[in-house]
């Protein structure tokens, strides 16, 4: 008698379906829900459906695990062979918007909360272009999954666990650590024989497939979908895809984004900033040309009107040419252009041109001095303003904080 048909419902087959029928339906549904075939805004939902189909097939394709599922279902108590695996009730709820507990669809049946495994975080460097346009990141990962033969118990069918001999059934061991010549600390560590359960199977009762560990390594290609509004340190989560263990709810695999430095743009929030390099002639007379290539590959043409003179350090704002504010609308931040004027090199302007420029450009007013003021003629040398105040003679000294030897005071008699 079949006590639970949820996995069959996911694969859209009858619980008496043959192995060939199950395989055929799995291939059809896997192709239908494959994330690569979904639009970018539906990829996460498709990935959830695809994972649910995959997990259901992983159990039903194996005759032994299918038999155990038919006998005990997914949520029985002491006899459950699937406890600690992927939570298919959550998968069903995400796929169909229903609560599939032991009482059936729509029933609010409380469920014992299981311990949760650790998350796995992968740091990923991404270009500013990919953060602007969005990207699918594929990551090949290896994780521990519940053994398909023993469903994570680590022992043969109907074999009983016994107190772990390594930790005396406590699940932890005492660990002595020398922290100094005459000092030792005592701490507890999880038993590596029973993985903290306190019980284990004897040698003859252990599952031969996983050698009693309850898990086997599995390689999977995970897909993470970076939205076009992604920011530094954003986390993209594949829930429940970390290591599995018996009696444990798997943690998440997390992709944490780190933006690579960009040669042209600097980002702050939804805004971008770039240097606008122009010649002195352009600063004085205006220009009309492509000034840079945008993150989506467009050439950005800018018109500076004649008569509008630009100065070093001026800021020009181009509205709506920054980053996307979110993944659902076309609202964008602004592009800030910082004017950087390139002056001509020494000797480029001849004597005749110099006289013409002096006639055209306004002159600087002279500093007025008294007739009897002593005038010194000086010349400068090229320098670096960052060296200002850096005279080695005054290094590590605070101006105005000098101390002097004083005259000893006479003590009162």
Curated annotation (Swiss-Prot):
GO terms for molecular function: Hsp70 protein binding; protein-folding chaperone binding; unfolded protein binding; zinc ion binding. GO terms for biological process: protein refolding. It is found in: Endoplasmic reticulum membrane. It comes from the Eukaryota. Transmembrane segments: none annotated. A zinc finger (CR-type) spans 134-219. A lipid is attached at residue 410 (S-farnesyl cysteine). Residues 6-73 form the J domain. The keyword ATP-binding does not apply. Its main location: endoplasmic reticulum. Keywords: Chaperone, Endoplasmic reticulum, Lipoprotein, Membrane, Metal-binding, Methylation, Prenylation, Repeat, Zinc, Zinc-finger. CXXCXGXG motif repeats lie at residues 147-154, 164-171, 191-198, 207-214. It is a lipid-anchor. GO terms for cellular component: cytoplasm; endoplasmic reticulum membrane; mitochondrion; nucleus. Residues 411-413 form a propeptide. The modification Cysteine methyl ester is found at residue 410. The keyword Endoplasmic reticulum applies. PANTHER family: DNAJ-LIKE-2, ISOFORM A-RELATED (PTHR43888). This is DnaJ protein homolog xdj1. The lineage of its organism: Eukaryota, Fungi, Dikarya, Ascomycota, Taphrinomycotina.
């Amino acid at each position: 008698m079949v006590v639970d048909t949820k996995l069959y419902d996911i694969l859209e087959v009858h619980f008496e379906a043959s192995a060939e029928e199950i395989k055929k339906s799995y291939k059809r549904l896997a192709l239908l829900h494959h994330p690569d075939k979904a639009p970018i805004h539906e990829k996460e939902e498709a990935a959830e459906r695809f994972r649910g189909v995959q997990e259901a097939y992983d159990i039903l394709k194996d005759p032994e695990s299918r038999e155990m599922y038919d006998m005990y279902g997914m949520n029985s108590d002491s006899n459950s062979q699937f406890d600690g695996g992927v939570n298919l009730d959550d998968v069903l709820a995400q796929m169909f918007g229903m609560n599939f507990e032991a009482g059936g669809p729509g029933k609010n049946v409380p469920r014992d909360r299981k311990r949760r495994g650790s998350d796995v975080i992968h740091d990923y460097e991404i270009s500013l272009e990919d953060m602007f346009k969005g990207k699918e990141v594929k990551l090949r990962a290896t994780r521990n999954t519940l053994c398909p033969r023993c469903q994570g118990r680590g022992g043969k069918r109907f074999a009983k666990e016994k107190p772990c001999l390594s930790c005396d059934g406590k699940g932890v061991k005492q660990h002595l650590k020398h922290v100094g010549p005459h000092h030792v600390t005592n701490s507890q560590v999880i038993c590596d024989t029973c993985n903290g359960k306190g019980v284990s199977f004897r040698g003859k009762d252990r599952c031969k497939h996983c050698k009693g560990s309850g898990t086997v390594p599995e390689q999977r290609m995970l897909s993470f979908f970076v939205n076009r509004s992604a920011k530094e340190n954003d986390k993209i989560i594949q829930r429940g895809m970390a290591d599995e263990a018996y009696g444990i709810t798997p943690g998440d695999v997390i992709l944490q984004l780190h933006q690579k430095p960009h040669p042209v743009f600097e980002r702050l929030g939804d805004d971008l900033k770039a240097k606008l390099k122009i010649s002195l002639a352009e600063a004085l007379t205006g220009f009309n040309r492509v000034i840079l290539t945008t993150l989506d590959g467009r050439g950005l043409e800018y018109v500076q009107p004649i008569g509008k003179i630009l100065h070093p350090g001026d800021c020009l704002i181009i509205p709506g040419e920054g980053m996307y504010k979110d993944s659902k609308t076309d609202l964008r931040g602004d592009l800030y252009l910082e004017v950087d004027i390139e002056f001509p090199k020494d000797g480029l302007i001849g004597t005749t041109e110099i006289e013409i420029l002096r006639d055209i450009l306004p002159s600087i007013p002279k500093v007025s001095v008294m007739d009897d003021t002593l005038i010194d003629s000086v010349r400068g040398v090229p320098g670096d303003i960052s060296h200002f105040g850096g005279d080695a003679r005054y290094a590590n000294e605070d101006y105005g904080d000098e101390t002097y030897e004083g005259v000893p005071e006479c003590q009162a008699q």
